[in-house]
Amino acid sequence: MNALLTNPFKERLCKGEVQIGLWLSSTTAYMAEIAATSGYDWLLIDGEHAPNTIQDLYHQLQAVAPYASQPVIRPVEGSKPLIKQVLDIGAQTLLLPMVDTADQARQVVSATRYPPYGERGVGASVARAARWGRIENYMAQVNDSLCLLVQVESKTALDNLDKILDVQGIDGVFIGPADLSASLGYPDNAGHLEVQRIIETSIRRIRDAGKAAGFLAVAPDMAQQCLAWGANFVAVGVDTMLYSDALDQRLAMFKSGKNGPRIKGSY
């Protein structure tokens, strides 16, 4: 099987194109496939806060594979064994949470690369990513098709942002607004003016360094603002929030005193 590995999400990032995404937290392949038919450029399959197992992530990757929407996997943390598993099931783009230092960034880069460039364990014959050993020269191709994104979501990470941006192998940096605002002393208040100022300057620093800048904004005006600041991969909703708000809104049509949509914050 002489297949050439490609990653359309990474290719568009490298061109500086804007890509609009959706957060998937419902943990089901059925819901993931519905989202994939909607036309979002990318879909974040969340393994950090949503209760996804490695099998759940695998099934959702299978569900979205026939469609143009590109999957991005966020594991619960960036350990070498977990990164290996997620890559083996076929993830090509990873979003790794809580990367605070350049050393951590270098460690996760190493975990995604096969020797001699890194420490990823070899198991192509049992990996969906290599079509169970049927993709010729998989190990030689895969480094170029992998896309590695890291989350900056603490004051420590902000202090180290320039050093993180200098790490070779990091393709983009995602600003985590909820955790970042809490770390800065404004819990549950990503809309605070000081937090907004820091988000804007961080996005501009990321883009000036030649990296992609990402953000999650469930409020449309915040999403538009981040796009104006230069963010080029922006998630504009969370499936569970959209679902619960749609349910509440429909019920409010028929029962008095019921609340309408609640989408206001960042996550």
From Swiss-Prot:
Cofactor note: Binds 1 Mg(2+) ion per subunit.
Record's keyword annotation contains Magnesium: yes
Residues annotated as site: Increases basicity of active site His: 88
Keyword Lyase: yes
Site feature (Transition state stabilizer) residues: 74
Gene3D superfamilies to which the protein is assigned, alphabetical: Phosphoenolpyruvate-binding domains
Protein name according to UniProt: 2-keto-3-deoxy-L-rhamnonate aldolase
